[in-house]
Regions:
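Generic, low-specificity signal for short hydrophobic/alpha-helical stretches with a mild N-terminal bias
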Residues: 5, 9, 120, 124, ...
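Alpha-helical oligomerization segments
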Residues: 156, 160-194
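Extended assembly-interface/linker segments at domain junctions
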Residues: 71-149
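N-terminal, leucine/charged-rich tether regions that mediate assembly and partner docking
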Residues: 1-88
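Generic structural signal for short, solvent-exposed loop/turn connectors between secondary structure elements
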Residues: 1, 74, 149-152, 193-194
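Alpha-helical scaffold domains
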Residues: 134-136, 140-143, 147-150, 154-158, ...
């Protein structure tokens, strides 16, 4: 699936009941209901490790797991995906599946997602000399983030997050400026945007 090596396939179902039992505290209250409303089932499809693909492990990363999450709705809550990433305590590449579309998600300082695509449009390549560099490459493949010279991957993710935040603030200010009736306030808002 998605051009990952056959030797890495494990196809192990992950039952929600076990997750509810093991992480009862984290899934207390309405979190469990929201989790259940979004997620139908989960399957660990691949384990990318030194044993399965003959790529050297690092101190931080001994394996990368690929988790396929069958969704009940395309409008899922990102918090559920973040929670899955944090609960497992492993490096996870998450494949979200709804009807015939797929979306890749990965958590590296924050949740990064690709656009929804057909299965044949997605090709995951194992690029790197060790699992650390393979993980970094997965992050860039999923997010589309291009690491600029002099930045680490985490620094570049933070730069991209700041760009998104500023673009949202500009869009909000432009909307307020268009709605503003008083010309002086409108002029001041336009000046702030520029």
């Amino acid at each position: 699936m998605f051009d990952l090596p056959k030797t890495s396939e494990i196809r192990k179902p992950l039952h929600k009941k076990l997750i509810y039992e093991k992480y009862a505290v984290e899934l207390s209250g309405n979190k469990k209901d929201k989790f259940d409303a979004d997620i139908s089932r989960m399957i660990i499809t691949n384990e990318i490790s030194e044993a399965s693909v003959n790529i050297k492990a690092t101190e931080e990363i001994s394996a990368i797991f690929v988790l396929q999450v069958e969704l009940k709705t395309k409008e899922y809550d990102d918090k559920n995906i973040v929670m899955i990433s944090k609960l497992f305590g492993q490096k996870l590449l998450i494949i979200l599946h709804y009807e015939n579309k797929y979306q890749l998600a990965i958590y590296e300082t924050r949740l990064l997602k690709s656009d929804w695509k057909d299965e044949e449009e997605i090709s995951l390549k194992l690029n790197g000399l060790d699992l650390g560099s393979v993980w970094d490459d997965f992050v860039t493949q999923v997010s589309g983030i291009d690491v600029q010279d002099g930045n680490t991957l985490v620094e570049q993710i933070n730069v991209e997050a700041e760009k998104e935040k500023l673009q949202k603030q500009i869009a909000d200010l432009e909307l307020k400026a268009r709605k503003e009736v008083q010309s002086k306030k409108k002029f001041e808002m336009v000046q702030r945007i520029q």
